Amino acid sequence: MKPPMDLDSLLTQTPAKDNAALERVLAAARGELALRRPVRRWRTQAVGLMAASAGLGLLAAVVLLAVGAVTGPLLLARAPLLAMLVGTSAVCAWGALSPKGRWMRRLGVGLAVVSAAALVLARGAPHSPPSFPGWVCTVSHLAIGVVPLVVALFALRGAFFQPLRAVVAGLSVGSTGALLGELACEQDWRHVLSHHLLAWVVITVVLVVISKSLKPRSYAP
């Protein structure tokens, strides 16, 4: 019968080395280093996400103005809200990709909440009956967010998954549809709440879910 093991002596023992496992780890590390993948700076990726989200929304504004779908006076009247959405998108994009942007992520969430409330409160009674069903706005907002969604997912793979980081990236992406809604839709606050903001929430949730399921290229903070 074996004598009972002394816990103190067991804890002080040096664990046996598994040379085979160590060699496999070293081989995998050397293989990763041999790939020499180009490293993109997070600032460059943040600017790219800003361009893909807020930039795409502003491009839509220029196109709508050029084809006569939006008038100059309407654009000027909505300018404060548009500026707020662009600022929210920029702060969220920067905070999502900054390694030390925790405070900026919280600021981005706060700005998104304020912007959403402003979009609802700024809407008055519609000047004309709706010419299309409300779900058209939701679908169009989701559609215009596809490109910035892909850009955000690619950028987020450069670091390990963090829920708040993914949320603010989704809020940046969702602001694109919100910009479009302020330009192309004249319906009341109920419509904004139930269709415009719904699309913003949906695209944020989709980005968080997909980002969590993707394997990161790096485990940097």
UniProtKB/Swiss-Prot annotation:
Single GO biological process annotation from the record: carotenoid biosynthetic process
Subcellular location(s) per record: Cell inner membrane
Disulfide cross-links: none
Induction: By light.
CC per GO annotation: plasma membrane
Origin organism lineage: Bacteria, Pseudomonadati, Myxococcota, Myxococcia, Myxococcales
Its membrane topology: Multi-pass membrane protein
Protein name listed in UniProt: Carotenogenesis protein CarR
The entry's keywords: Carotenoid biosynthesis, Cell inner membrane, Cell membrane, Membrane, Transmembrane, Transmembrane helix
Function (record text): Negative regulator of the carotenoid synthesis regulon. It is probably inactivated by protoporphyrin IX in the presence of blue light. Inactivation of CarR leads to loss of negative control over the carotenogenesis protein CarQ.
This protein's record includes keyword Cell wall biogenesis/degradation: no
Superkingdom as given in the UniProt entry: Bacteria
Transmembrane domains' residue ranges: 56-76, 79-99, 107-127, 136-156, 166-186, 191-211
